[in-house]
Amino acid sequence: MADQLYLSLWYPNFRLESLPAALVGVLRQFALIAKDGQANSALGRVAAASVYPIDWTESPTYQRIYVNDDRAQTSEDTEGSIIENAVAEATEQLHDDMAYEFEMRWMLWLPDVSEGGLDTVWRLEPWRVKITGFGPQFDAGSFEQNGQIRVDFGLDTPWVLEDESLDEDGAERIKHNVEKLLAFTLSVEKHCGISSRLLWTESGEPLAEKLIARLQRLN
């Protein structure tokens, strides 16, 4: 059964004033992996930003959706969706009981279930990721469990399709997805000044070990 996949990040001696810079750092590392060498890719920009007060039951006090298109000329959206600009605008008013959420996209290999025939067709599809920074009082101080910054990868389907359902081509596609996930995780650990991190699932299954074991098998 599909499970929700997260990466929680904790920082040493963290202060609320440090949150915008920490968010920019994580978003930049994600953009580097998502762009995959494409200098002007829209995948390197923020797709949406939201600010939630108190806890997740409240409506956002700020929300902006960006229209990113590499073919479009420079516009208010393309300028605003640059990581530094999007974070600066959303965090202009920093409060310790708010969460600051930024959506980005990366391309992952997914099976196309709509295709007929016996052979599975794999396609690179955009996959949404949410990167959220938490004020220390948001949701009764849930940052202690979620991290000062939490990355929500969505459902774990692109990384944990069962081996028995995969042919050689499918195994290679899943391997690519796993490598991208691990590359981002290691990049954050190396460049973002964190004190600890945890890759976890909503069900509590130890997915990190499962992913590493899968990658070793595919190699």
Walk through the language-model features, giving the residues of each:
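Acidic, proline/glycine-rich low-complexity IDRs
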Residues: 143-219
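Structured alpha/beta or helical-core interaction and ligand-binding surfaces enriched in interleaved
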Residues: 1-167, 199
